Amino acid sequence: MARHSFFCVDGHTCGNPVRLVAGGGPNLNGSTMMEKRAHFLAEYDWIRTGLMFEPRGHDMMSGSILYPPTRPDCDVAVLFIETSGCLPMCGHGTIGTVTMAIEQGLVTPKTPGKLNLDTPAGLVAIEYEQDGQYVERVRLTNVPAFLYAEGLEVECPDLGPIKVDVAYGGNFYAIVEPQENYTDMDDYSALQLIAWSPVLRQRLNEKYKFQHPELPDINRLSHILWTGKPKHPQAHARNAVFYGDKAIDRSPCGTGTSARMAQLAAKGKLKPCDEFIHESIIGSLFHGRVERAAEVAGRPAIVPSIAGWARMTGYNTIFIDDRDPFAHGFSMA
């Protein structure tokens, strides 16, 4: 029996939690971060569930673990952990991780104000603005994003048949826009969206195949993005992003914003250099931008960037005690 200790720096990005594991993370095998992610999932997923789920975490908890980079063009590598698993990429997690890692001196950039992250989804370039000891803003240039499928039909509880577009922005997103059986996210409660989303996700994954053309380990739809009209005067659109089993992202969701921009660009509604300001369910904003056009295995794509802010909330030394019947966490149905 052992008691495992993890030193964490806690914070949030635009309202959504980030738990940066600064000490206690396991050594991982693999020549790439995708391979290290696979090793973590095979042998150490109890760390994720123990730190993310109750009683040490909660349904919305999201986090990261820092590693030495596996590629020479990067400053640091990041493994993303949350209640839904080990995501290949996490936008709000990146902004929070970079903010806290810089402020706490956990990483020293080769060039001040810039940082290259080695993630399972690929290289993510960072620019950050620092005022004294505090990081005030982080802009990440994400992996290429693309529209994967249009008009996929699925039966939604209570609403009936709806159509969704699926886009990739670091994860696969089903995007639900206004249509005959769905009006606007504001017309439904968060509890309704949380109840419908896992059913939609399961039915879509059973009915359709979602496979990244270059990354074989990215092979399922993981998120549902419900759209709505913005309330903030600066915003172009509003969203409620569902992930995990019962979570609505409190931030505007970085990879979700990337997927949304890719969808809009594919339909001619955004072009390179266009700005896209995305509003979350609680009113916080991400400032997106289409950096340039791209291709992914012959598919039209974009390279999106996302800017946002994060704040550290404290230090947390967490024990996972093998004697504890809830050592590996639990989630209430």
UniProtKB/Swiss-Prot annotation:
Keywords: Isomerase. Substrate binds at residues 91-92, 249, 254-255. Gene3D superfamilies: Diaminopimelate Epimerase, Chain A, domain 1. GO terms for molecular function: 4-hydroxyproline epimerase activity. Inhibited by iodoacetate, iodoacetamide and by high amounts (10 mM) of pyrrole-2-carboxylic acid (PYC). Not inhibited by PYC at 1 mM. The active site is at 90 (proton acceptor), 253 (proton donor). Coiled coil: none annotated. The keyword Coiled coil does not apply. It catalyses: trans-4-hydroxy-L-proline = cis-4-hydroxy-D-proline. Homodimer. Belongs to the proline racemase family. This enzyme does not require pyridoxal phosphate (PLP) as a cofactor. This is 4-hydroxyproline epimerase.
